[in-house]
Amino acid sequence: MSAQIENSIPLDFDLGNMAAFDISPLDETKLSGSEKESFLFSLSRDNVQQLVNKMISLPKERTSDGVLLQLPETVTPLPRAKPLPKPKPETKWQRFARIKGIAPKKREGRLVFDEASGEWVPKWGYKGKNKELETQWLVEEGEKEKKLTSKQVRNTSKKIKRSRRH
């Protein structure tokens, strides 16, 4: 099934990239004449045939999807479209934290065990432990709140809500 083709200079193959490199010089008379298209077509066909012959000789693996070829490692390194990203410079805070030995808070510090539900819940935020007082239909007044006048109640309502949360 494979056709044997002979070149004066053998091709360089990189089967990992499925590429063949022809370094033989081209015939200038055929490139400038009217046979240019047919010459390039036949040269390309011969080189592709040699590449296919080499690919067929590789070890094969049969799977449910079909026959797969085991490609060897690449020989030619391919260039990247963009340069490798440079490491980001350290911020002032990161430098300060590294010098002082400050570590970021761990996730476990944000959770509290809720004995009523038997699960770990966040301290703050959505479904947090701090929302527990807001959902209760009855909250006892403390001694401090009983002594306040109506004007003081209006002015200190925010303070009371904050003090209950903690």
UniProtKB/Swiss-Prot annotation:
The lineage of its organism: Eukaryota, Fungi, Dikarya, Ascomycota, Taphrinomycotina. Residues 156-166 have a biased composition (Basic residues). The modification Phosphoserine is found at S34, S64. This is Ribosome biogenesis regulatory protein homolog. One of its GO terms (biological process) is endonucleolytic cleavage in ITS1 to separate SSU-rRNA from 5.8S rRNA and LSU-rRNA from tricistronic rRNA transcript (SSU-rRNA, 5.8S rRNA, LSU-rRNA). InterPro entries: Ribosom_reg (IPR007023). The keyword ATP-binding does not apply. It is found in: Nucleus, Nucleolus. Keywords: Nucleus, Phosphoprotein, Ribosome biogenesis. Its main location: nucleus. Component of a hexameric 5S RNP precursor complex, composed of 5S RNA, rrs1, rpf2, rpl5a/rpl5b, rpl11a/rpl11b and syo1; this complex acts as a precursor for ribosome assembly. Interacts with sad1. One of its GO terms (cellular component) is nucleus. Belongs to the RRS1 family. Involved in ribosomal large subunit assembly. Residues 144-166 are annotated as: Disordered. It comes from Schizosaccharomyces pombe (strain 972 / ATCC 24843).
